């Protein structure tokens, strides 16, 4: 998947790296490219109101992050559950009208989730970094910031809002960015969940030093179609290398039934990331019990 980047702004310098993105012509070709183009402008606006230097100062005064990877390894369920606090998505629209991020997060904790994921994208998922901060204040589990990370700025912002881990999507990042962002995340004591959807993306990520956690997204982010066999096919193709490197695997998207969980666990997944099928239920705690029964 080749994502064109769009940014009308001048170069941005972070430490010794200089970021400048060519502006493509035309309209976005699919929803993922539309999200990326919008995110570039969104981050520019955030930088104007809260500079990166200020974020980095704030991070220095925070307590150490929790061990997200360790929580997966010692999962309270099998496979370990990353339960997602999610109001909406481009494919489903609003999933839960009476959305209360704190109440949902607390229900997940009660249900036995090992970690939580909080959507922070506003335009396409109706999330926010404020939701991440609210959840951080209300629960003790490790938190993943589920965001379309394009710049180091977003990593520091996620940390200031209480994230212990951040999502990096291979489809929207170059190899250089993946490697550099991973180093920033590790320097901050956080965990990177690096998401792939294809064998090409998986091979790119496996070639990067220091990767410990990979998410296999069963959803094609160009079409938003879901196929659970994505997890089994990628793991079957690279199982030996993944095991040799000691990398943990999370299966993401399209998980709705106990049979789905059994399928991806037998394929080799150490954990699952589930949002929609839990959020839409009146009682998310009971929904977890029904899935993991």
Swiss-Prot record:
The lineage of its organism: Bacteria, Bacillati, Cyanobacteriota, Cyanophyceae, Oscillatoriophycideae. It catalyses: 1-(2-carboxyphenylamino)-1-deoxy-D-ribulose 5-phosphate + H(+) = (1S,2R)-1-C-(indol-3-yl)glycerol 3-phosphate + CO2 + H2O. GO terms for molecular function: indole-3-glycerol-phosphate synthase activity; phosphoribosylanthranilate isomerase activity. This is Indole-3-glycerol phosphate synthase. Pfam families: IGPS (PF00218). PROSITE patterns: IGPS (PS00614). Coiled coil: none annotated. It comes from the Bacteria. InterPro entries: Aldolase_TIM, Indole-3-glycerol_P_synth, Indole-3-glycerol_P_synth_dom, Indole-3-GlycerolPSynthase_CS, RibuloseP-bd_barrel. The keyword Amino-acid biosynthesis applies. The keyword Lyase applies. Belongs to the TrpC family. It comes from Rippkaea orientalis (strain PCC 8801 / RF-1). Gene3D superfamilies: Aldolase class I. Its EC number is 4.1.1.48. Pathway: Amino-acid biosynthesis; L-tryptophan biosynthesis; L-tryptophan from chorismate: step 4/5. One of its GO terms (biological process) is L-tryptophan biosynthetic process. Keywords: Amino-acid biosynthesis, Aromatic amino acid biosynthesis, Decarboxylase, Lyase, Tryptophan biosynthesis.
């Amino acid at each position: 998947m080749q994502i064109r980047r769009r940014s009308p702004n001048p170069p941005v310098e972070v430490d010794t790296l200089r970021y400048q993105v060519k502006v493509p012509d035309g309209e976005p070709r699919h929803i993922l490219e539309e999200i990326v183009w919008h995110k570039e402008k969104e981050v520019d606006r955030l930088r104007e109101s809260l500079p990166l230097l200020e974020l980095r100062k704030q991070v220095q005064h925070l307590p150490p992050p929790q061990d997200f990877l360790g929580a997966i390894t010692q999962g309270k369920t099998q496979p370990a559950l990353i339960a997602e606090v999610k109001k909406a998505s481009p494919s489903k629209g609003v999933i839960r009208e009476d959305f209360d991020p704190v109440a949902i997060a607390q229900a997940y904790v009660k249900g036995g989730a090992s970690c939580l994921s909080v959507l922070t994208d506003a335009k396409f998922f109706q999330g926010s970094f404020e939701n991440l901060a609210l959840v951080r204040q209300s629960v003790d589990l490790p938190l993943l910031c589920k965001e379309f990370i394009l710049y180091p700025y977003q990593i520091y912002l996620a940390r200031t809002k209480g994230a212990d881990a951040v999502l990096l999507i291979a489809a929207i990042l170059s190899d250089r960015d993946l490697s550099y962002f991973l180093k920033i995340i590790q320097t901050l004591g956080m965990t990177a969940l690096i998401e792939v959807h294809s064998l090409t993306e998986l091979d790119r990520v496996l070639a990067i030093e220091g990767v410990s956690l990979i998410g296999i997204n069963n959803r094609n982010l160009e079409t938003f179609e879901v196929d659970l066999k994505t997890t089994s096919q990628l793991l079957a193709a690279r199982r030996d290398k993944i095991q040799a490197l000691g990398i943990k695997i999370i299966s993401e998207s399209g998980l709705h039934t106990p049979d789905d969980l059994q399928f991806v666990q037998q394929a080799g997944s150490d954990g699952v990331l589930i949002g929609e099928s839990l959020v839409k239920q009146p009682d998310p705690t009971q929904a977890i019990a029904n899935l993991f029964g």
